[in-house]
Amino acid sequence: MEDEFTPVSLGRNGAFSGEVVFVGYGITAPELNYDDYANMDVRGKVVIVLRKEPRQNDPSSPFDGTQPSQHAFFSSKELNAAMHGAAALIFVNDQTTVARSGADQLPKLTAAGSAINDQQIPTLYCLRSTVDKLLQSAGGESLHALEMAIDRDIAPHSYALAGIHASGETHIVQSQTPVRM
């Protein structure tokens, strides 16, 4: 599993356990009449969230066209998951990020946040292939199909993954290294 998951340093350290729920891009944007958490009870559950936002390559996207809106940021998604009561957050790369980098890669620990915040929830990163297996083993569509549907409809396609439970623990230790100038 070490090759499939990595902790993200913007979340807090700690153990988590709960049912798994896919919540699309993990966005709550009342100003756009869009909410991936609408009608979803994620309290005490582990949420899977796509990076970025719907139609990120479309200049006419309601989410600030091709520029990332406030809803695209790691910290916004993590805070939103915590505000909805999630036990943990699992990020997964969106298709555009994979296409631009040429591969689905886990970020280096410092690449997706740098401050441990004990007020938040444990946050991890997972490979698309692993998330895809989870979604399909729960009888759902592929991650690609879900992402395409959300982008097409500009509407959530969130659902609980029946019979799927996740547990784990994140423990990140920050250290400072003195530098001589």
Outline where the language-model segments fall:
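Noncatalytic luminal/extracellular "stalk/propeptide" segments of secretory-pathway proteins
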Residues: 1-60, 158-160, 165, 171, ...
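Active-site glycine-rich loop that binds ribose-phosphate moieties when present
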Residues: 30, 69-75
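Composition- and surface-driven signal marking solvent-exposed, interaction-prone regions
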Residues: 62, 103-104
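Glycine-centered flexibility motif
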Residues: 24-26, 65, 75, 95, ...
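Mature extracellular/periplasmic domains of secretome proteins
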Residues: 11, 36-42, 78-87, 104-114
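Well-ordered alpha-helical segments embedded in enzymatic catalytic cores
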Residues: 76-77, 180
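Proteins synthesized as precursors that undergo proteolytic processing into mature forms
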Residues: 60-68
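Long, well-ordered, tryptophan-enriched scaffold segments
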Residues: 83-100, 108-180
